[in-house]
C-alpha cells in the first residue's frame, strides 16, 4: 500500500515535466542522432584503416611467396588445382588417330621430350607449380616431366605440385603428361627412406633377388606403385633389368636382381606387375644391359664386349620377357656393343641396336626382341652422350636410331629446335615422328 502511494505521487510531476518541455525532448533526440553519426563515421574510418592494413599484409605475403617460390605466382596457382570431373562430362575422349590429326608438327615433336621442371621453366629449383609452370606448359607442352629429390619435399607439397601440373597439361593440350620419378627401391630412391614421407627404405634389389622369392619383388612394385599413385605420379624409371654378367661391375651391382637372365627376368617382371597394377608405367632399363660393363655411362664411354649370341642368351632375356609381360617402356642405355654393331656408337644412337634388334625389323626375327612399347633414351645429359654429341645432334640421332622419347637433353631448347629443323629439312620424316607419337598416345589414352 505504501509503495503504491509513492508510485502514484511520482506520476503527476513527470506528467507536468513532459507537458512543459517538448523542446528539450527534441534537443535530446538531436544529440543522440549526432552521436550516432559520429560513431558511424569513426567506425567507417576504422574499417578503412583495417582494410588498408590487410591489403599491406597481403602485398607483403605475396612478396614473401614470390621470394620462396621464384617464378611461380601462387595466387594464380590457387585456381582450382584438381581436374573437375564436371568439365569432362559429356565430352567424347579423343582417339589416338584423332589426336594425331589435330596436332601440329610442333606439338608432336614436343611430345617426344621428357625434361626436368627446371629445364621446362628456367627456374633454378622447382618445388611448386604456379603461373610460371602453366605458362611454360602452354608454350612447350612436352610429353613428360621427371622429378628428383630436390623437387620432392613432403607428401602434401608433391601432391599439390603434380595435381596442378597435370591440370595445366589437360587444360592446355587435352593430353596428360607422363609425370615420372626414379624410384627403384634400395640404392636408388627419391622418396622411400626419407623421414618427411614416412616410407621405410627397401632392401637393395640384389638382396631381393638373392631371396629366391619373386613374390618379394612384386611386393616392392606394389608398395612403390601405391605411394607413387597416391602422390600423383604415373611413371617410374624402374625396374633395373640388367643382368650382372660382369663381376667387376659396380654401376648396377646392388641394383640388379642377379647374374642369371631368367632369374632377373622373373623378378623384374614382378616389379612391373606391381607398379602397373596401380597405373604406374614401368620402365625396364638399361638395354642392352649395363651389367656387362665396367665403366659408368654417367661419366663417359661405357661398353659391353659381349656378342649378340651372348646378349640374346642372357642380357636380353629380361627385356624380351618384360616386353611380353606388358612393360610400357624400355630405356635404351648409352652403352656401346662393338661386337654387335662393329663400332663404338652407344646403343641409344644405334639403328642396329634399337630398330633392328630391340624393335625388330623383318629379316631379323631370329635375333630380335620385337618390342612394341615406348623406347625412351637414358638421360641425354650423361657423359657418354655429351662427350661426343651436341644436344641437337644427340636428339636427332636417337630418333633416327628408333627411340620414341628423349630424356633430359643437356640443352632442351637446342634439342627441340634441332628435331624440328631435322623434320623441316627432311633429315627426319614426319611419318617417323608420327610413329613415336602414336606409341606415346596409346599409353596415355590407355
What is the predicted function of each stretch?
Residues 110-117, 143-147, 177-183, 235-239, ...:
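Hydrophobic faces of well-ordered beta-strands that scaffold small-molecule active sites
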Residues 171, 177-221:
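Substrate-binding cleft of extracellular glycoside hydrolase catalytic domains
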Residues 424-446:
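Mid-to-C-terminal alpha-helical segments outside catalytic/metal-binding sites
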Residues 201-272, 276:
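A substrate-binding/cap region within the structured catalytic cores of diverse enzymes
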Residues 104, 123-125, 129, 156-173, ...:
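Second-shell residues forming the walls of enzyme active-site clefts
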Residues 191-197, 234-254, 281, 285-302, ...:
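Active-site-proximal loop/short-helix segments
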Residues 2-179, 183-193:
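N-terminal hydrophobic targeting/anchoring segments and the immediately downstream early-domain regions
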Amino acid at each position: 500500500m505504501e509503495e503504491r502511494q509513492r508510485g502514484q505521487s511520482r506520476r503527476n510531476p513527470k506528467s507536468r515535466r513532459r507537458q512543459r518541455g517538448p523542446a528539450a525532448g527534441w534537443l535530446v533526440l538531436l544529440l543522440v542522432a549526432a552521436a550516432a553519426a559520429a560513431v558511424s563515421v569513426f567506425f567507417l574510418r576504422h574499417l578503412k584503416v583495417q582494410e588498408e592494413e590487410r591489403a599491406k599484409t597481403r602485398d607483403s605475403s605475396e612478396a614473401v611467396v614470390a621470394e620462396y617460390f621464384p617464378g611461380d605466382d601462387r595466387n594464380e596457382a590457387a585456381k582450382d588445382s584438381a581436374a573437375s570431373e564436371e568439365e569432362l562430362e559429356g565430352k567424347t575422349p579423343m582417339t589416338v588417330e584423332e589426336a594425331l590429326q589435330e596436332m601440329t608438327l610442333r606439338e608432336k615433336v614436343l611430345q617426344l621430350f621428357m625434361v626436368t621442371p627446371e629445364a621446362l621453366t628456367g627456374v633454378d629449383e622447382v618445388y611448386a607449380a604456379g603461373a610460371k609452370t602453366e605458362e611454360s606448359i602452354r608454350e612447350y607442352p612436352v610429353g613428360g616431366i621427371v622429378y628428383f629429390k630436390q623437387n620432392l619435399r613432403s607428401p602434401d607439397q608433391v601432391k599439390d605440385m603434380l595435381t596442378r601440373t597435370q591440370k595445366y597439361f589437360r587444360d592446355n593440350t587435352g593430353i596428360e603428361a607422363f609425370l615420372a620419378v626414379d624410384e627403384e627401391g634400395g640404392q636408388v630412391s627419391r622418396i622411400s627412406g626419407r623421414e618427411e614421407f614416412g616410407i621405410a627404405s627397401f632392401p637393395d634389389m640384389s638382396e631381393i633377388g638373392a631371396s629366391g622369392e619373386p613374390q618379394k619383388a612384386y611386393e616392392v612394385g606394389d608398395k612403390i606403385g601405391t605411394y607413387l599413385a597416391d602422390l600423383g605420379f604415373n611413371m617410374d624409371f624402374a625396374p633395373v633389368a640388367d643382368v650382372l654378367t660382369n663381376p667387376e661391375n659396380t654401376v648396377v651391382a646392388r641394383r640388379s636382381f642377379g647374374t642369371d637372365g631368367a632369374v632377373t627376368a622373373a623378378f623384374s617382371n614382378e616389379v612391373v606387375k606391381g607398379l602397373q597394377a596401380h597405373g604406374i608405367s614401368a620402365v625396364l632399363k638399361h638395354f642392352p644391359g649395363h651389367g656387362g660393363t665396367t665403366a659408368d655411362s654417367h661419366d663417359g664411354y661405357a661398353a659391353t664386349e659381349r656378342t649378340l649370341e651372348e646378349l640374346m642368351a642372357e642380357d636380353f632375356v629380361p627385356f624380351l620377357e618384360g616386353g611380353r609381360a606388358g612393360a610400357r617402356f624400355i630405356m635404351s642405355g648409352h652403352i656401346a656393343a662393338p661386337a654387335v654393331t662393329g663400332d663404338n656408337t652407344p646403343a641409344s644412337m644405334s639403328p642396329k641396336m634399337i630398330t633392328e634388334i630391340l624393335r625388330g625389323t623383318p629379316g631379323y626375327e631370329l635375333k630380335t626382341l620385337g618390342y612394341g612399347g615406348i623406347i625412351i633414351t637414358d638421360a641425354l645429359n650423361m657423359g657418354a652422350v655429351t662427350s661426343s654429341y651436341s644436344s641437337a645432334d644427340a636428339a636427332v640421332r636417337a630418333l633416327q636410331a628408333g627411340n620414341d622419347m628423349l630424356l633430359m637433353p643437356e640443352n632442351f631448347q637446342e634439342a627441340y629446335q634441332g628435331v624440328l629443323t631435322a623434320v623441316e629439312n627432311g633429315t627426319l620424316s614426319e611419318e617417323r615422328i608420327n610413329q613415336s607419337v602414336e606409341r606415346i598416345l596409346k599409353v596415355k589414352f590407355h
